[in-house]
Amino acid sequence: MANERLYGPKTRIGLASVFHFADWQNPTAAEMNEISGGIDMTGSIWDLSCALDLDNTTFDLGDSDTDDELSFCQWAGSANPTEYNPEIVYTAFRATEPWIVSDPASLNQANAAFHLLAWRGVEYYAWVSVGKEPGEAFAVGDRVSLMRVETDFGIDDVSTGGNSKISQTFGFKSQILWNHKITA
């Protein structure tokens, strides 16, 4: 559609339990499609696309440390990454009633995002997939990036006249799968 925004809504982004994937290096479409829609906290993978703030959410590889030393067999200017430097920050809109989890009518992605992002020391796979709208099923050929991360304390962002948000800057836990094509 000609009027569709450049950045959306063609991005799906969320979290998964570290126990969700049988093989984290080869996630399947079936595993990705077990998404609870972001409101079922008993699941193990959550789509938070509609709860995350586009302007303040980051899922990127920063400048990686590289080994620039060359042997006689390498081309000039070649550099091998020695350590990846992912930058993952999820900033979610706060729910109006974040503590109500027993009333299913009050649950939404903002509630789920708060409960997943507010606490320190929880490990997840942060994931992103570009190309389909939130809620669309994953299929063979779709691409997904995921990184194992750990939460820090969620930081509230409250300002006069603005939306209340919670921001989580994740710590990287060394497992990275970047732009992987789903094959099964």
Predicted regions: what they are:
Residues 143-184:
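Mixed-charge, glycine-accented linear interaction segment located at domain edges/termini
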Residues 6-8, 12, 100-104, 170-172:
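Short, surface-exposed, charge-dense and proline/glycine-enriched linear segments
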Residues 2-95, 148-163:
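Solvent-exposed edge beta-strands and adjacent loop segments
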Residues 69-146, 175-184:
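Extracellular/virion structural assembly segments
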Residues 18-37, 103-118, 166-180:
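Short N-terminal helix-initiation segments at or just after the protein's N-terminus
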